[in-house]
């Protein structure tokens, strides 16, 4: 993304993928813009400006996770989505909350490595070409004559041209490539991720520097050598420093299902452990330093977006200290028939476009009539009201059921055009959507 995207531009970008929920989009757009604003502020004050964390409240399937995911993609920032229910209080068996930052650091290193390798790709391609040409046309030994070098240069240029045009792709060559580190998958007990990671990194260093001779096609060798040469050109220490800085300044953590760790006063049971997870989250959200294998990472400027349906609990059931760490609260609306219709037609990768593309591969042209789309939206909305409100995810079930027979026999219908109108939808779905017992199990 352009770093100078205004909040309205961010919202219009999110509109391409998520229907409605303008309040939530507005809140995350402002949060993202504030990061850029903070970078423009002078140093003593800049350190004092911390992100305002967001709490999204709304039923499942209305776009909470998708908003956070698209925002991270837009910002090109390290992003991690985790369920709050996965964590246990320190001292209990299970994952502790510090692993959130460690996982985010891993994500940032991977992201930064990809970005750095893209920058040196042109140089890496040239070096890979030269290594393949050295195998195809070994360079002459220097015996004091200038003439053979010219001939070799001409032959080399000819082969280089053929290589670039793909004429040598199927030719088999033998060359030396780096031997990968021995693959060791170590399963550690819950809560011992640090120790497991240290053992894994210890074994990862064993195979470094070793070379293997392998036979492979030129096309396969070229890809392998590009990665190898790019890895040589990338400075690992700088890369790790950039990744750590990226996590500290731009990291986004999406805490899903936060309502499931809220203590409900009328219920007894495992409330101690729930409150313990909330207390463990507190320093992380407020700002602390976490030790990772890439160095110490401060969480002061990481943006936390929490979400929950809050069916059985309320935001006020969270411990007061944690409530205070999420000053921006946004309620997301349930989806209406009009929203469902827009989801099916207006988003960039709508379900209708996906099914059209899938069936096109079999030679079937799928056409969705306006009345067919409205009927689908009405059925999805009706089943959500009668059975269980699972939001936009209901459309997956409805669409699969609608196109089940067509998808199964698509290879026999090649060259045909199938129109999905209201009559087609009613023929296949009206009995199911009308019968509450059937829709409970099928739709």
UniProtKB/Swiss-Prot annotation:
| UniProt keyword Secreted present | no
Q: Has UniProt tagged this entry with the keyword Cell membrane? A: no
Q: Which GO terms describe its cellular component?
A: HslUV protease complex
User: Which keywords label this protein?
Assistant: ATP-binding, Chaperone, Cytoplasm, Nucleotide-binding, Stress response
Q: Where does ATP bind?
A: 19, 61-66, 256, 321, 393
GO terms (molecular function) for this protein are:
ATP binding; ATP hydrolysis activity; peptidase activity; proteasome-activating activity
Q: Name one GO biological process term.
A: proteolysis involved in protein catabolic process
Q: Which Pfam families match?
A: AAA, AAA_2
Quote the subcellular location field of this record.
Answer: Cytoplasm
Query: Can you tell me which family this protein belongs to?
Result: Belongs to the ClpX chaperone family. HslU subfamily.
Give the PANTHER family listed for this entry: ATP-DEPENDENT CLP PROTEASE ATP-BINDING SUBUNIT CLPX-LIKE, MITOCHONDRIAL-RELATED, ATP-DEPENDENT PROTEASE ATPASE SUBUNIT HSLU
**Functional summary from the UniProt entry:** ATPase subunit of a proteasome-like degradation complex; this subunit has chaperone activity. The binding of ATP and its subsequent hydrolysis by HslU are essential for unfolding of protein substrates subsequently hydrolyzed by HslV. HslU recognizes the N-terminal part of its protein substrates and unfolds these before they are guided to HslV for hydrolysis.
Q: Which NCBIfam families match?
A: hslU, PRK05201.1
**What does the subunit section of this Swiss-Prot or TrEMBL entry state?**
A double ring-shaped homohexamer of HslV is capped on each side by a ring-shaped HslU homohexamer. The assembly of the HslU/HslV complex is dependent on binding of ATP.
The name on file for this protein is ATP-dependent protease ATPase subunit HslU
Q: Which organism is it from?
A: Ralstonia pickettii (strain 12J)
Tell me the classification of the organism that encodes this protein.
Answer: Bacteria, Pseudomonadati, Pseudomonadota, Betaproteobacteria, Burkholderiales
